């Protein structure tokens, strides 16, 4: 089962992601993230820091995703493991949609086409939603020069996340990221446990 944690920077998703490993330790989850720790992931981070060409940046994210699938996600899923990833395909669909606006006609359609036929869609996506000003206060990056951390960018990203939810409501669980972390952890953790147990029951019946 593949679970992804999504949200704008400062939403609390990384805090939740780190806490889910111990909370669900009895399920022995594979805890992972995008961008990864490979040289491709480092290239992605460098591209962000150095404001690389938006198309080049998007394709680096896709390359990192391909490596992540091959090295972590596919092997774990083939063993029926629970995989929990901090960021995944939805992050590209929203963040790169912002950076590619005005450069590529209909960036989201283009991004989906790039992934078509080889990616694996999540079984459950937990989206932490917080007001953009709250997220910026948490990260201490209000007015940051990094393009992904500017208020106008995060506002669009939040909007695009909600559009994805409307397109695939069954996959998403939206949680209020302003609630206490322990409450968010309990709700998210039990939702994952329920879905994982449900999928295992269905496999045993088939």
UniProtKB/Swiss-Prot annotation:
Record NCBIfam families: DTMP_kinase (TIGR00041)
EC number of the protein: 2.7.4.9
Family: Belongs to the thymidylate kinase family.
Catalytic activity: dTMP + ATP = dTDP + ADP
UniProt xrefs under CDD domains: TMPK (cd01672)
GO BP term, example: dTDP biosynthetic process
UniProt-annotated binding residues for ATP: 7-14
Keyword Kinase: yes
GO MF annotation terms: ATP binding; dTMP kinase activity
Record key words, sorted: ATP-binding, Kinase, Nucleotide biosynthesis, Nucleotide-binding, Transferase
PANTHER family, alphabetized: THYMIDYLATE KINASE (PTHR10344), UMP-CMP KINASE 2, MITOCHONDRIAL (PTHR10344:SF4)
Keyword ATP-binding part of the UniProt annotation: yes
Domain of life: Archaea
Top-level class of the enzyme under EC nomenclature: transferase
Protein name, as recorded: Probable thymidylate kinase
Taxonomic path: Archaea, Methanobacteriati, Methanobacteriota, Stenosarchaea group, Methanomicrobia
One GO cellular component term: cytoplasm
């Amino acid at each position: 089962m593949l679970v992804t944690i999504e949200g704008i920077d400062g939403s609390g998703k990384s805090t939740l992601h780190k806490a889910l490993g111990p909370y669900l330790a009895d399920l022995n989850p594979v805890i992972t993230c995008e961008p990864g720790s490979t040289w491709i992931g480092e290239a992605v981070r460098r591209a962000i820091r150095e404001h690389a060409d938006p198309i080049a940046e998007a394709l680096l994210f896709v390359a990192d995703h391909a490596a992540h699938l091959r090295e972590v996600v596919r092997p774990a899923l083939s063993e029926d493991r629970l995989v929990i990833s901090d960021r995944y395909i939805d992050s590209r669909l929203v963040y790169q949609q912002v950076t590619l606006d005005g450069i590529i006609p209909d960036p989201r359609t283009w991004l989906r086409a790039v992934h078509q036929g080889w990616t694996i869609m999540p079984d459950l996506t937990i989206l932490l939603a917080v007001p953009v000003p709250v997220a910026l206060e948490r990260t201490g990056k209000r007015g940051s020069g990094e393009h992904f951390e500017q208020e106008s960018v995060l506002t669009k990203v939040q909007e695009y996340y909600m559009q994805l939810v409307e397109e695939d409501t069954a996959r998403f669980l939206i949680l209020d990221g302003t609630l206490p972390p322990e409450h968010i952890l309990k709700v998210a953790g039990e939702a994952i446990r329920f879905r994982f147990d449900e999928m295992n029951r269905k496999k045993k019946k088939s």
